Swiss-Prot record:
Its main location: secreted. SUPFAM superfamilies: (Trans)glycosidases (SSF51445). Belongs to the glycosyl hydrolase 53 family. It is found in: Secreted. This is Probable arabinogalactan endo-beta-1,4-galactanase A. InterPro entries: Glyco_hydro_53 (IPR011683), Glycoside_hydrolase_SF (IPR017853). It comes from Aspergillus tubingensis. The gene is galA. Glycans are attached at N128. One of its GO terms (biological process) is cell wall organization. GO terms for molecular function: arabinogalactan endo-1,4-beta-galactosidase activity; glucosidase activity. It catalyses: The enzyme specifically hydrolyzes (1->4)-beta-D-galactosidic linkages in type I arabinogalactans.
Protein backbone atom coordinates (compact mmCIF):
# COMPACT_ATOMS: atom_id res chain seq x y z
CA UNK A 1 0.00 0.00 0.00
CA UNK A 2 2.95 2.34 0.44
CA UNK A 3 3.87 2.48 -3.23
CA UNK A 4 0.44 3.50 -4.59
CA UNK A 5 0.25 6.25 -2.00
CA UNK A 6 3.63 7.59 -3.04
CA UNK A 7 2.74 7.47 -6.70
CA UNK A 8 -0.58 9.19 -6.14
CA UNK A 9 1.24 12.04 -4.45
CA UNK A 10 3.42 12.83 -7.47
CA UNK A 11 0.80 14.79 -9.46
CA UNK A 12 0.17 16.93 -6.40
CA UNK A 13 3.85 17.82 -6.24
CA UNK A 14 4.00 18.84 -9.89
CA UNK A 15 0.80 20.90 -9.63
CA UNK A 16 2.56 23.30 -7.27
CA UNK A 17 4.66 24.67 -10.15
CA UNK A 18 3.99 28.24 -11.23
CA UNK A 19 1.49 28.71 -14.04
CA UNK A 20 3.58 31.50 -15.58
CA UNK A 21 7.36 31.14 -15.68
CA UNK A 22 8.01 34.21 -17.72
CA UNK A 23 10.41 36.81 -19.04
CA UNK A 24 10.01 40.24 -20.61
CA UNK A 25 12.13 40.33 -23.78
CA UNK A 26 10.63 43.46 -25.33
CA UNK A 27 14.03 44.76 -26.47
CA UNK A 28 14.86 41.61 -28.48
CA UNK A 29 14.27 42.99 -31.99
CA UNK A 30 16.18 46.18 -31.20
CA UNK A 31 19.11 44.17 -29.87
CA UNK A 32 19.14 41.95 -32.95
CA UNK A 33 19.07 45.02 -35.22
CA UNK A 34 22.15 46.23 -33.33
CA UNK A 35 23.96 43.05 -34.33
CA UNK A 36 23.57 40.95 -31.20
CA UNK A 37 23.21 37.18 -31.64
CA UNK A 38 22.48 35.17 -28.52
CA UNK A 39 24.19 31.92 -27.65
CA UNK A 40 22.82 29.02 -25.63
CA UNK A 41 24.62 27.24 -22.81
CA UNK A 42 26.58 25.20 -25.36
CA UNK A 43 27.92 28.37 -26.95
CA UNK A 44 25.81 27.87 -30.07
CA UNK A 45 24.01 30.79 -31.71
CA UNK A 46 20.27 30.38 -31.24
CA UNK A 47 17.17 32.58 -31.24
CA UNK A 48 16.58 33.96 -27.76
CA UNK A 49 12.99 32.75 -27.64
CA UNK A 50 14.18 29.19 -28.35
CA UNK A 51 16.87 29.41 -25.68
CA UNK A 52 14.28 30.53 -23.16
CA UNK A 53 11.61 27.95 -23.96
CA UNK A 54 14.24 25.19 -23.88
CA UNK A 55 15.10 26.26 -20.34
CA UNK A 56 11.58 26.30 -18.94
CA UNK A 57 10.17 29.73 -19.82
CA UNK A 58 6.55 29.39 -20.93
CA UNK A 59 5.31 32.98 -21.21
CA UNK A 60 6.69 36.23 -22.65
CA UNK A 61 5.80 39.77 -21.63
CA UNK A 62 5.92 42.52 -24.28
CA UNK A 63 5.63 46.26 -23.67
CA UNK A 64 3.46 48.13 -26.14
CA UNK A 65 3.76 51.86 -26.85
CA UNK A 66 1.09 53.74 -28.78
CA UNK A 67 2.96 55.95 -31.29
CA UNK A 68 6.68 56.07 -30.48
CA UNK A 69 8.78 58.42 -32.59
CA UNK A 70 11.02 55.65 -33.95
CA UNK A 71 8.55 52.76 -33.98
CA UNK A 72 10.15 51.00 -31.02
CA UNK A 73 7.62 48.83 -29.19
CA UNK A 74 4.67 49.95 -31.33
CA UNK A 75 1.96 47.58 -32.53
CA UNK A 76 3.82 46.42 -35.66
CA UNK A 77 6.98 45.79 -33.63
CA UNK A 78 5.01 43.70 -31.15
CA UNK A 79 3.29 41.68 -33.85
CA UNK A 80 6.68 40.65 -35.23
CA UNK A 81 7.91 39.66 -31.78
CA UNK A 82 4.69 37.88 -30.82
CA UNK A 83 4.72 35.73 -33.96
CA UNK A 84 8.11 34.41 -32.94
CA UNK A 85 7.02 33.90 -29.34
CA UNK A 86 3.92 31.97 -30.37
CA UNK A 87 5.89 29.87 -32.86
CA UNK A 88 8.27 28.93 -30.04
CA UNK A 89 5.32 27.67 -28.00
CA UNK A 90 5.05 30.35 -25.32
CA UNK A 91 2.05 32.45 -24.28
CA UNK A 92 1.95 36.22 -24.80
CA UNK A 93 1.34 38.91 -22.21
CA UNK A 94 0.85 42.45 -23.57
CA UNK A 95 1.88 45.23 -21.22
CA UNK A 96 0.07 48.31 -22.57
CA UNK A 97 1.96 51.41 -21.42
CA UNK A 98 -0.78 53.66 -22.87
CA UNK A 99 1.85 56.20 -23.81
CA UNK A 100 4.24 56.92 -26.67
CA UNK A 101 7.14 56.22 -24.32
CA UNK A 102 7.91 54.74 -20.91
CA UNK A 103 5.06 54.79 -18.41
CA UNK A 104 5.81 54.25 -14.71
CA UNK A 105 5.02 55.94 -11.37
CA UNK A 106 7.08 58.99 -12.35
CA UNK A 107 5.57 59.57 -15.78
CA UNK A 108 2.29 58.58 -17.40
CA UNK A 109 2.20 60.85 -20.45
CA UNK A 110 -0.97 60.64 -22.55
CA UNK A 111 -0.30 59.60 -26.18
CA UNK A 112 -0.15 62.26 -28.87
CA UNK A 113 -3.62 63.03 -30.19
CA UNK A 114 -5.47 61.66 -27.16
CA UNK A 115 -7.54 64.04 -25.05
CA UNK A 116 -5.99 65.69 -22.00
CA UNK A 117 -9.08 67.78 -21.18
CA UNK A 118 -12.19 65.59 -21.46
CA UNK A 119 -12.49 62.27 -19.63
CA UNK A 120 -15.36 60.97 -21.76
CA UNK A 121 -13.35 61.48 -24.93
CA UNK A 122 -10.29 59.86 -23.36
CA UNK A 123 -12.17 56.79 -22.15
CA UNK A 124 -13.58 56.31 -25.64
CA UNK A 125 -10.11 56.65 -27.18
CA UNK A 126 -8.74 54.10 -24.72
CA UNK A 127 -11.56 51.66 -25.45
CA UNK A 128 -10.92 51.93 -29.19
CA UNK A 129 -7.18 51.49 -28.69
CA UNK A 130 -7.36 48.32 -26.61
CA UNK A 131 -9.99 46.99 -29.01
CA UNK A 132 -7.74 47.76 -31.99
CA UNK A 133 -4.68 46.14 -30.42
CA UNK A 134 -6.55 42.93 -29.62
CA UNK A 135 -8.34 42.81 -32.97
CA UNK A 136 -5.03 43.25 -34.79
CA UNK A 137 -3.60 40.29 -32.91
CA UNK A 138 -6.75 38.31 -33.75
CA UNK A 139 -6.40 39.18 -37.45
CA UNK A 140 -2.87 37.82 -37.34
CA UNK A 141 -3.97 34.59 -35.61
CA UNK A 142 -1.94 35.39 -32.51
CA UNK A 143 -3.39 34.36 -29.16
CA UNK A 144 -2.99 36.67 -26.18
CA UNK A 145 -2.94 35.29 -22.65
CA UNK A 146 -2.81 38.51 -20.58
CA UNK A 147 -3.35 42.22 -21.22
CA UNK A 148 -2.28 44.79 -18.64
CA UNK A 149 -4.23 48.07 -18.73
CA UNK A 150 -1.31 50.36 -18.00
CA UNK A 151 2.12 49.83 -16.48
CA UNK A 152 2.88 50.45 -12.79
CA UNK A 153 -0.15 52.71 -12.31
CA UNK A 154 -0.06 53.36 -8.56
CA UNK A 155 0.24 57.06 -9.47
CA UNK A 156 -2.49 56.79 -12.07
CA UNK A 157 -2.40 56.57 -15.85
CA UNK A 158 -2.95 58.85 -18.84
CA UNK A 159 -2.04 62.07 -17.06
CA UNK A 160 -3.35 64.62 -16.32
CA UNK A 161 -6.91 63.26 -16.44
CA UNK A 162 -5.93 59.94 -14.89
CA UNK A 163 -3.91 61.28 -11.96
CA UNK A 164 -4.64 60.08 -8.43
CA UNK A 165 -6.27 63.42 -7.66
CA UNK A 166 -9.29 61.88 -9.41
CA UNK A 167 -9.76 58.16 -8.76
CA UNK A 168 -13.12 58.18 -10.49
CA UNK A 169 -11.32 59.06 -13.72
CA UNK A 170 -8.82 56.26 -13.11
CA UNK A 171 -11.68 53.83 -12.55
CA UNK A 172 -13.46 54.94 -15.73
CA UNK A 173 -10.28 54.52 -17.74
CA UNK A 174 -9.57 51.04 -16.40
CA UNK A 175 -13.18 49.99 -17.02
CA UNK A 176 -13.09 51.32 -20.58
CA UNK A 177 -9.73 49.76 -21.38
CA UNK A 178 -10.85 46.41 -20.03
CA UNK A 179 -13.97 46.40 -22.16
CA UNK A 180 -11.99 47.10 -25.30
CA UNK A 181 -10.22 43.82 -24.60
CA UNK A 182 -13.44 41.98 -23.72
CA UNK A 183 -15.20 43.18 -26.88
CA UNK A 184 -12.35 42.16 -29.19
CA UNK A 185 -12.35 39.39 -31.77
CA UNK A 186 -9.76 37.27 -29.98
CA UNK A 187 -11.05 33.70 -29.82
CA UNK A 188 -10.19 33.44 -26.14
CA UNK A 189 -10.54 36.64 -24.13
CA UNK A 190 -7.21 37.51 -22.50
CA UNK A 191 -6.98 37.79 -18.75
CA UNK A 192 -7.10 41.48 -17.86
CA UNK A 193 -4.56 42.74 -15.36
CA UNK A 194 -4.03 45.81 -13.20
CA UNK A 195 -0.32 46.32 -12.51
CA UNK A 196 1.14 48.36 -9.64
CA UNK A 197 4.72 48.91 -8.51
CA UNK A 198 6.16 48.13 -5.04
CA UNK A 199 4.45 44.78 -4.65
CA UNK A 200 5.95 44.44 -1.17
CA UNK A 201 4.05 47.51 0.08
CA UNK A 202 0.60 46.34 1.19
CA UNK A 203 -0.44 49.86 2.21
CA UNK A 204 0.15 51.10 -1.33
CA UNK A 205 -1.69 48.19 -2.91
CA UNK A 206 -4.63 48.41 -0.51
CA UNK A 207 -5.07 52.16 -0.89
CA UNK A 208 -5.15 51.97 -4.67
CA UNK A 209 -7.62 49.09 -4.97
CA UNK A 210 -9.81 50.22 -2.09
CA UNK A 211 -10.06 53.75 -3.48
CA UNK A 212 -10.54 52.92 -7.15
CA UNK A 213 -13.17 50.24 -6.48
CA UNK A 214 -15.04 52.53 -4.07
CA UNK A 215 -15.84 54.88 -6.97
CA UNK A 216 -18.19 52.32 -8.49
CA UNK A 217 -16.85 53.11 -11.97
CA UNK A 218 -14.54 50.09 -11.94
CA UNK A 219 -16.13 46.75 -11.16
CA UNK A 220 -14.36 43.78 -9.66
CA UNK A 221 -15.52 41.80 -12.68
CA UNK A 222 -13.67 44.17 -15.03
CA UNK A 223 -10.29 42.59 -14.31
CA UNK A 224 -8.93 39.12 -13.63
CA UNK A 225 -5.39 39.47 -12.29
CA UNK A 226 -3.38 41.72 -10.00
CA UNK A 227 0.22 42.22 -11.08
CA UNK A 228 3.07 43.75 -9.10
CA UNK A 229 6.66 44.79 -9.66
CA UNK A 230 9.14 43.54 -7.09
CA UNK A 231 12.66 44.94 -7.22
CA UNK A 232 14.84 44.26 -4.17
CA UNK A 233 17.41 46.95 -5.01
CA UNK A 234 15.13 50.00 -4.69
CA UNK A 235 14.29 49.74 -0.97
CA UNK A 236 15.57 47.97 2.12
CA UNK A 237 11.90 47.49 3.04
CA UNK A 238 11.29 45.26 0.01
CA UNK A 239 11.70 42.03 1.94
CA UNK A 240 10.36 38.71 0.78
CA UNK A 241 8.41 38.62 4.02
CA UNK A 242 6.70 41.92 3.19
CA UNK A 243 5.99 40.73 -0.33
CA UNK A 244 4.34 37.56 0.99
CA UNK A 245 2.16 39.58 3.37
CA UNK A 246 1.17 41.98 0.62
CA UNK A 247 0.34 39.30 -1.96
CA UNK A 248 -1.58 37.26 0.60
CA UNK A 249 -3.64 40.29 1.61
CA UNK A 250 -4.27 41.29 -1.99
CA UNK A 251 -5.57 37.87 -2.91
CA UNK A 252 -7.70 37.44 0.20
CA UNK A 253 -9.18 40.94 0.06
CA UNK A 254 -9.96 41.08 -3.66
CA UNK A 255 -10.20 37.38 -4.58
CA UNK A 256 -7.94 37.72 -7.62
CA UNK A 257 -4.87 35.72 -8.61
CA UNK A 258 -1.57 37.57 -8.19
CA UNK A 259 1.53 37.65 -10.41
CA UNK A 260 4.98 39.20 -9.94
CA UNK A 261 5.33 40.70 -13.41
CA UNK A 262 8.70 42.44 -13.05
CA UNK A 263 11.73 41.42 -11.02
CA UNK A 264 15.54 41.22 -11.25
CA UNK A 265 18.59 40.06 -9.34
CA UNK A 266 22.10 41.34 -10.13
CA UNK A 267 25.22 39.46 -11.11
CA UNK A 268 27.14 42.65 -10.33
CA UNK A 269 26.20 45.44 -7.92
CA UNK A 270 29.36 47.04 -6.51
CA UNK A 271 27.74 50.31 -5.43
CA UNK A 272 24.00 49.93 -4.71
CA UNK A 273 22.10 53.14 -4.07
CA UNK A 274 19.96 51.47 -1.40
CA UNK A 275 20.61 48.74 1.15
CA UNK A 276 19.27 45.35 0.12
CA UNK A 277 16.40 43.87 2.18
CA UNK A 278 17.48 42.01 5.32
CA UNK A 279 16.15 38.60 4.25
CA UNK A 280 18.06 38.74 0.94
CA UNK A 281 21.52 39.88 2.06
CA UNK A 282 22.92 36.33 2.09
CA UNK A 283 22.24 35.87 -1.63
CA UNK A 284 25.33 36.53 -3.77
CA UNK A 285 25.45 38.84 -6.77
CA UNK A 286 26.05 36.11 -9.34
CA UNK A 287 24.29 33.70 -11.66
CA UNK A 288 23.96 31.31 -8.73
CA UNK A 289 22.46 34.18 -6.75
CA UNK A 290 19.91 34.79 -9.48
CA UNK A 291 18.83 31.18 -9.22
CA UNK A 292 18.60 31.33 -5.44
CA UNK A 293 16.65 34.58 -5.50
CA UNK A 294 14.13 33.32 -8.05
CA UNK A 295 13.68 30.05 -6.19
CA UNK A 296 12.96 31.95 -2.98
CA UNK A 297 10.63 34.31 -4.82
CA UNK A 298 8.81 31.36 -6.38
CA UNK A 299 8.32 29.87 -2.91
CA UNK A 300 6.64 33.08 -1.83
CA UNK A 301 4.37 33.27 -4.88
CA UNK A 302 3.47 29.56 -4.74
CA UNK A 303 2.70 29.95 -1.04
CA UNK A 304 -0.05 32.45 -1.79
CA UNK A 305 -3.47 31.17 -2.81
CA UNK A 306 -3.75 31.78 -6.56
CA UNK A 307 -0.15 32.94 -6.81
CA UNK A 308 0.33 32.30 -10.51
CA UNK A 309 3.76 33.33 -11.65
CA UNK A 310 6.90 35.39 -12.08
CA UNK A 311 8.25 37.38 -15.04
CA UNK A 312 11.94 38.33 -15.12
CA UNK A 313 12.32 41.80 -16.62
CA UNK A 314 14.62 42.06 -19.66
CA UNK A 315 17.14 39.28 -18.91
CA UNK A 316 18.93 39.78 -22.25
CA UNK A 317 19.04 43.56 -22.81
CA UNK A 318 22.80 43.70 -23.33
CA UNK A 319 22.85 47.40 -24.22
CA UNK A 320 21.20 48.22 -20.87
CA UNK A 321 22.70 45.73 -18.42
CA UNK A 322 21.84 47.74 -15.30
CA UNK A 323 18.20 47.87 -16.38
CA UNK A 324 17.71 51.31 -14.86
CA UNK A 325 18.99 50.34 -11.43
CA UNK A 326 22.16 51.32 -9.55
CA UNK A 327 23.45 47.77 -10.06
CA UNK A 328 25.90 47.22 -12.90
CA UNK A 329 24.38 44.07 -14.38
CA UNK A 330 21.04 42.32 -13.84
CA UNK A 331 21.11 40.19 -16.97
CA UNK A 332 21.01 36.44 -17.52
CA UNK A 333 23.37 36.88 -20.46
CA UNK A 334 27.12 37.49 -20.40
CA UNK A 335 27.57 41.01 -21.79
CA UNK A 336 30.96 40.10 -23.27
CA UNK A 337 30.07 36.86 -25.04
CA UNK A 338 26.26 37.16 -25.56
CA UNK A 339 25.97 33.67 -24.06
CA UNK A 340 23.22 32.99 -21.56
CA UNK A 341 24.22 32.34 -17.97
CA UNK A 342 23.55 29.10 -16.12
CA UNK A 343 20.84 30.92 -14.16
CA UNK A 344 18.51 30.71 -17.15
CA UNK A 345 17.91 27.06 -16.26
CA UNK A 346 16.12 28.07 -13.06
CA UNK A 347 12.82 28.49 -14.89
CA UNK A 348 12.59 24.71 -15.28
CA UNK A 349 12.29 24.42 -11.52
CA UNK A 350 9.91 27.29 -10.73
Amino acid sequence: MIYPLLLSALPLLSSAALTYRGADISSLLIEEDAGISYKNLNGETQALEDILVNNGVNSIRQRVWVDPSDGSYDLDYNLKLAKRVQAAGMSIYLDLHLSDTWADPSDQTTPTGWSTTDIDTLTWQLYNYTLEVCNTFAENDIDVEIVSIGNEISSGLLWPLGKTSNYDNIAKLLHSGAWGVKDSDLTTTPKIMIHLDNGWDWDEQEYFYKTVLATGSLLSTDFDLMGVSYYPFYSSEATLSSLKTSLTNMQSNYDKPVVVVETNWPVSCPDPEYSFPSDLTSIPFSAAGQEEFLEKLAEVVEGVTDGLGIYYWEPAWIDNAGLGSSCADNLMVDVNTDEVLESVTVFEDL
